[in-house]
A protein has these predicted regions:
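A short C-terminal boundary segment appended to hydrolase-like catalytic domains
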Residues: 300, 308-336
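Active-site mouth loops of central-metabolism enzymes
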Residues: 7-18, 85-100, 180-193, 251-259
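Hydrophobic faces of well-ordered beta-strands that scaffold small-molecule active sites
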Residues: 7-13, 32-36, 61-67, 116-120, ...
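Glycine-rich anion/phosphate-binding loops
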Residues: 42-49, 90-107, 139-147, 189-192
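Second-shell residues forming the walls of enzyme active-site clefts
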Residues: 39-57, 73, 149-316
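N-terminal hydrophobic targeting/anchoring segments and the immediately downstream early-domain regions
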Residues: 1-63, 71-79, 334-336
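Glycine-rich, aromatic-flanked loop segments that form ligand/cofactor-binding clefts
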Residues: 55-80, 98-124, 144, 152-168
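Short, acidic/polar
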Residues: 13-27, 97-108, 193-199, 259-267
Length: 336
C-alpha cells in the first residue's frame, strides 16, 4: 500500500512571528516539526506567544531548539546561561551538577511551550574538533556516559525526552560539518571501543539520536546520517536502539555530498531517519517538501514519543527545586 509521507520534515521560520507563508508551510501534513533559532527569540513571553501561534496552526507539531549550554544555547535573554558541559567534569560532584543542568534546561524550554532541546552531546572531546570542543562532557567515554546519563535524568524528571548527538561520534573529525564534509579515518573497532560507548551505555535512556554529517570511510562511503550501515546495522541492530532518529540539518555543507535538498531528504529517510531537518534555507525546505510529498513511506509512530511529558509552570522560579538547582550551580561557580 502506498502511504503519503506525513510528519517527517522539521523546518524553521525566519522571524519572531509567523507570516502567511510560514502558516501555509506548517499546514502541510509532511511537516512534523519546527525548530527555533536565536533569530526567533526575544524573551520568554515572546517565545511562549510564538509557540502558541504555531500550535494554533498545527497543534501536533513537535517544537524544538538547540539548548545545550555553553556556546550552543538559543534561549538567552531571561534564561539561565548554563555552562558548557565540559566545565562540569572538573567538579567532585560533577554528576549531581550535570543532573541539575539537565533539569534547569528542560524546565525552561518546556515553560515557553517547546517540546525538546536536541541534547545532550555525546561526542568525545579529543581536543581535535573545534565544533565539538567544550560541548562534550569528557574525552573518556565511560565518564562521558556517566555525566550525560545524569544530564538525561534531569531532563526526564522535568518531562523532556533526550536526544543523543552526533552518532557515532563527531569528536575525532577536525572539519566542521556546518561548512565542510568531515572524514574520520579510524576503523570501526576504534570507534566502537571509544565513541560508541556513550551511545551504547545510554541506548535505553535516549528517546532519540541525531547522526553526524561525517564520513567514516572504513565503515561506509556515505555520511552516517545517510548510511544504512550506521543507522540500521549498527544503531538499530548492534545497539538495539528503538527511538527516533533525527537527521542533523540537511542544509549543512556536510550533507551536500548526496545532492540537492530533495536528494538529501530522500537519502536520510531511506537510510533510516524518522525525521529530517531542513533549516536556514526556505527554498531547500520547499524542495524537500516536494520530494516528501512524492515519496512512498510509512510515517514513523516513534516521533510522538518526543512530545513534552509535562508542561512547566511559568512560575517555575518559585519552585524549591529550582532554587536548589540554581544554588548548586552558583556555589560551583558555573553560573552567575
Amino acid at each position: 500500500m502506498t502511504v503519503a509521507l506525513q510528519g517527517s520534515l522539521m523546518v524553521d521560520v525566519a522571524g519572531t512571528w509567523l507570516t502567511a507563508e510560514d502558516r501555509h508551510l506548517l499546514r502541510q501534513p509532511e511537516v512534523g516539526g519546527l525548530i527555533i533559532f536565536a533569530r526567533n527569540i526575544e524573551h520568554p513571553r515572546q517565545v511562549r506567544e510564538l509557540s502558541a501561534a504555531i500550535r494554533a496552526v498545527r497543534p501536533d507539531l513537535l517544537l524544538a531548539v538547540d539548548q545545550e549550554g555553553g556556546r550552543v544555547q538559543r534561549l538567552r535573554q531571561g534564561f539561565v546561561r548554563l555552562p558548557a558541559m565540559r566545565a562540569l567534569a572538573a567538579h567532585p560532584n560533577a554528576e549531581y551538577l550535570a543532573e541539575q543542568c539537565g533539569w534547569i534546561m528542560a524546565t525552561e524550554v518546556l515553560a515557553v511551550g517547546l517540546d525538546l532541546s536536541f541534547a545532550p552531546v555525546l561526542d568525545l572531546d579529543y581536543q581535535r574538533s573545534a565544533v565539538v570542543g567544550t560541548r562534550a562532557f569528557e574525552g573518556d567515554p565511560e565518564r562521558a556516559a556517566v555525566l550525560a546519563g545524569a544530564f538525561i535524568r534531569g531532563m526526564n524528571s522535568a518531562g523532556m525526552a533526550a536526544t543523543g548527538k552526533h552518532f557515532p561520534g563527531h569528536g575525532w573529525a577536525e572539519a566542521d560539518s556546518h561548512v565542510a564534509i568531515p572524514n574520520d579515518e579510524r576503523s570501526l573497532e576504534q570507534i566502537r571501543a571509544n565513541d560508541l560507548v556513550p551511545f551504547a551505555r545510554l541506548s535505553k535512556q535516549l528517546a532519540a539520536v541525531m547522526p553526524a554529517h561525517v564520513i567514516y570511510p572504513q565503515v561506509d562511503a556515505q555520511p552516517a546520517g545517510f548510511s544504512r550501515r550506521w543507522l540500521q546495522d549498527i544503531l538499530r541492530g548492534e545497539l538495539q536502539f528503538d527511538g527516533v532518529i533525527f537527521s542533523d540539518d540537511l542544509s549543512m555543507a556536510g550533507a551536500h555530498v548526496v545532492g540537492d535538498a530533495a536528494s538529501r531528504i530522500e537519502a536520510a529517510l531511506t537510510a533510516g531517519c524518522d525525521m529530517g531537518l531542513v533549516c536556514n534555507d526556505r527554498a531547500a525546505a520547499e524542495l524537500a517538501l516536494t520530494a516528501a510529498q512524492r515519496m512512498k513511506v510509512t510515517p514513523s509512530a516513534r516521533i510522538a514519543r518526543m512530545r513534552a511529558q509535562a508542561k512547566a509552570s511559568t512560575d517555575y522560579k518559585q519552585d524549591p527545586r529550582w532554587m536548589l538547582a540554581v544554588g548548586a550551580l552558583r556555589d560551583a561557580q558555573l553560573i552567575e
